[in-house]
Amino acid sequence: MAKSHTLNPEEEFEEESGLRPSLLSEFIGQKEVLNNLTVYVQAAKNRKRALDHVLISGPPGLGKTTLAGIVSNELGTRLTITSAPVITKGADLARLLTSMGENEILFIDEIHTLHKKLEEILYPAMENYMIDLVIGEGVTAQMVQIPLKPFTLVGATTRSGLISEPLKSRFGIQLRLDYYNDEEMKEIVLRSSRILGVKIEDDAALEIGKRSRKTPRIANHLLKRIRDFSEVEGNLSVKKGLCLKAFEKMGIDDLGLDGMDRQILGCMIDRYKGGPVGLKAIAVVVGEEEKTIEDTYESFMVRIGLINRTPAGRVATEKAYRQLKRMQDFSENHGQDPTLF
């Protein structure tokens, strides 16, 4: 009988964390980013000083949080993780900053959502390791400067264009993560399978990688679901044929598109003749938040050429029609002879 891998939420979190690389040498892909970051980290270690503040941008799931953890491990310092949406008051941010030890790292995810008044607290903290606090109210109020220990702020964002220029300019190191290629995705799947104790053939790992939207987080999720199918069938190793059957059952196509992706494209084609159409209209039809569509679904489909963003709105490309096997609709929407396709 195959060994069960049913996990409770805590075990699931631990397993997920165990798949993250912990050192720069273990990180696959993002060569230029890694090469530069290796230099910056080594220089900080040599000087025995805090690393310059780091801004990491890129689509979700590419390794921004993982890189913050790696930097912490490489420098041998404590890492404090938080997210901008949960920092609602100046006192919250001040408490975080004053708790930082020398050369420690504060990681703030979704930093583009930080309120402008909170940004202003960060400016002197990042530049001079000081925060200005107002004590008291009215005529008795007075400004007090509180010194901080040297620390490194690592900010992560999926939307770097929304970060104000004054905040962005205070990050001495700015890194951009890009989508991974198929070979890198395959290596990530093989590494994760070794950690999980899953025997997998190379072509199966490549197939999982190709359908993971060029995103390691998705690859790890899909690997675990493929493991489920493999174990239930009593297989000793994961083969490509099993992957293809499992992906068909899960509704994931050869580009990694799932049901929601197809809903979005179908909405554009059926209701708006392929576009242009606004994001708000799409969100209402498919019943999903605009931000989720933009960050999770649309960015990938734009990248692989299924959607074009135009000043008038989103447009489904010819490739999108082909992927959905709807070239007849393309011909009708664009007034072209279907026999040409």
Curated annotation (Swiss-Prot):
InterPro entries: AAA+_ATPase, AAA_lid_4, DNA_helicase_Holl-junc_RuvB, P-loop_NTPase, RuvB-like_N, RuvB_C, WH-like_DNA-bd_sf, WH_DNA-bd_sf. It comes from the Bacteria. ATP binds at residues 19-20, 61, 64-66, 170, 180, 217. The keyword Electron transport does not apply. Residues 181-251 are annotated as: Small ATPAse domain (RuvB-S). Residues 1-180 are annotated as: Large ATPase domain (RuvB-L). One of its GO terms (cellular component) is cytoplasm. It is found in: Cytoplasm. Keywords: ATP-binding, Cytoplasm, DNA damage, DNA recombination, DNA repair, DNA-binding, Hydrolase, Nucleotide-binding. It holds the Pfam family RuvB_N. Its EC number is 3.6.4.-. DNA binds at residues 309, 314. It is an enzyme of class 3 (hydrolase). It catalyses: ATP + H2O = ADP + phosphate + H(+). One of its GO terms (molecular function) is four-way junction helicase activity. Mg(2+) binds at residue 65. Residues 254-341 are annotated as: Head domain (RuvB-H). GO terms for biological process: DNA recombination; DNA repair. Belongs to the RuvB family. The RuvA-RuvB-RuvC complex processes Holliday junction (HJ) DNA during genetic recombination and DNA repair, while the RuvA-RuvB complex plays an important role in the rescue of blocked DNA replication forks via replication fork reversal (RFR). RuvA specifically binds to HJ cruciform DNA, conferring on it an open structure. The RuvB hexamer acts as an ATP-dependent pump, pulling dsDNA into and through the RuvAB complex. RuvB forms 2 homohexamers on either side of HJ DNA bound by 1 or 2 RuvA tetramers; 4 subunits per hexamer contact DNA at a time. Has 3 domains, the large (RuvB-L) and small ATPase (RuvB-S) domains and the C-terminal head (RuvB-H) domain. The head domain binds DNA, while the ATPase domains jointly bind ATP, ADP or are empty depending on the state of the subunit in the translocation cycle. During a single DNA translocation step the structure of each domain remains the same, but their relative positions change. HAMAP family: DNA_HJ_migration_RuvB (MF_00016). Homohexamer. Forms an RuvA(8)-RuvB(12)-Holliday junction (HJ) complex. HJ DNA is sandwiched between 2 RuvA tetramers; dsDNA enters through RuvA and exits via RuvB. An RuvB hexamer assembles on each DNA strand where it exits the tetramer. Each RuvB hexamer is contacted by two RuvA subunits (via domain III) on 2 adjacent RuvB subunits; this complex drives branch migration. In the full resolvosome a probable DNA-RuvA(4)-RuvB(12)-RuvC(2) complex forms which resolves the HJ. PANTHER family: HOLLIDAY JUNCTION BRANCH MIGRATION COMPLEX SUBUNIT RUVB, PTHR42848. This is Holliday junction branch migration complex subunit RuvB. The lineage of its organism: Bacteria, Pseudomonadati, Spirochaetota, Spirochaetia, Leptospirales.
